[in-house]
């Protein structure tokens, strides 16, 4: 969405050529009177949810409205949450696909991204390109994304827990190398893991804030130099840097979950380092509780089915071919309310 609001709306209209597409344009209650639009298909979206969204946006009073994300505190009031049950996209084709699923899209004048609500946890592991690939390959990619997310959250904590509290579960040869490396470092294992994770986050943030022509090179060179110097001086061990590097790379497989995954990774390492297996189990249930307690527009974030009337085996972790998927309507509301 690279143009003004009216042009972006016309782009959506050209993709969704149906009289059921509704585009409600309104002005925000701000000094600049910024325009925004609520887009949905009236034969697919739930009318009660549309009314709720319209009222929430009309009651919102942000000081400035530069992006659709400014509406989130009014759409999702209440407690702080790690996972936000809304998603964003800059691709008109993705926004059109979400509208056809029965979702609601919010566009703001001058903003390149559109807000889609409600969002489901499983959708973080899906993308529009999945449907351009074969069913087998896209299913493989989805499995890879799920594995990468759980690796980036739990792998450092599991490593700390096994190395400190349950070393008998580690193969002897690997355990010998870990112990030999840890004897040369002055920090406890979990503190060392936290330090490596924080250093990698600093390097990543520095690379993002620098000019694009230098950012990637600086990040790569910094990681190599700091890692080599840390091992040479005995401040950090090779196994810890290896595990932290795997998690730092795996988090980019699901970029929409980067923020919660980073915070959860730190929390899991702390819990595993301080309380061992009990802390690790507690962290797992805390993550599960956070996910299960999140909802948007009365749609649970952990809804089992992207589209309730379609079996999860057809478009879940494993995807069937698009011809079979097209035999069902793309509507997330239909069976939830017994229609």
Q: What is each PLM-predicted segment?
A:
Residues 238-240, 244-339:
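Hydrophobic alpha-helical transmembrane segments of membrane transport and translocation systems
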Residues 29, 70, 74, 112, ...:
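Flexible domain-boundary/linker segments
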Residues 1-192, 297-328, 332-339:
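Cytosolic regulatory modules rich in charged/polar residues
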Residues 148-167, 182-263, 268-273, 280:
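Transmembrane alpha-helix detector for multi-pass membrane proteins
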């Amino acid at each position: 969405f690279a143009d003004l609001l009216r042009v972006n709306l016309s782009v959506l209209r050209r993709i969704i050529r149906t009289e059921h597409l509704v585009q409600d344009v309104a002005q925000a209650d701000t000094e600049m009177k910024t325009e925004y639009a609520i887009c949905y298909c009236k034969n697919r979206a739930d009318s009660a949810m549309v009314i709720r969204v319209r009222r929430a946006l009309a009651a919102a009073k942000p000081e400035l409205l530069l992006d659709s994300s400014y509406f989130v505190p009014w759409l999702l009031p209440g407690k702080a949450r790690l996972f936000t049950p809304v998603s964003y996209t800059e691709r008109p084709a993705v926004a059109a696909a979400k509208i056809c699923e029965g979702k609601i899209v919010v566009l703001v004048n001058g903003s390149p991204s559109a807000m889609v609500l409600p969002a489901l946890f499983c959708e973080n592991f899906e993308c529009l390109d999945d449907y351009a690939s074969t069913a087998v390959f896209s299913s493989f990619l989805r499995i890879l994304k799920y594995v990468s997310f759980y690796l980036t959250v739990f792998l450092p904590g599991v490593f700390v827990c096994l190395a400190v509290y349950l070393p008998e579960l580690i193969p002897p040869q690997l355990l010998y190398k870990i112990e030999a490396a840890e004897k040369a470092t002055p920090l406890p294992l979990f503190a060392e893991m936290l330090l490596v994770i924080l250093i990698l986050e600093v390097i990543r943030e520095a690379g993002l804030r620098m000019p694009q022509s230098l950012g990637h090179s600086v990040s790569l060179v910094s990681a190599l130099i700091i890692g080599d110097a840390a091992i040479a001086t005995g401040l950090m061990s090779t196994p810890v840097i290896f595990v932290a590097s795997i998690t730092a790379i795996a988090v980019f497989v699901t970029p929409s979950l980067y923020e919660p995954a980073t915070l959860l990774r730190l929390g899991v390492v702390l819990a595993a380092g301080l309380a061992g297996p009990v802390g690790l189990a507690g962290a797992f249930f805390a993550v599960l509780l956070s996910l299960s307690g999140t909802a948007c527009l009365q749609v649970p974030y952990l809804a089992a089915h992207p589209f309730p009337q379609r079996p999860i085996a057809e478009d879940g972790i494993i995807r069937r071919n698009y011809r079979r998927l097209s035999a069902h309507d793309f509507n997330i509301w239909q069976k939830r309310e017994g229609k």
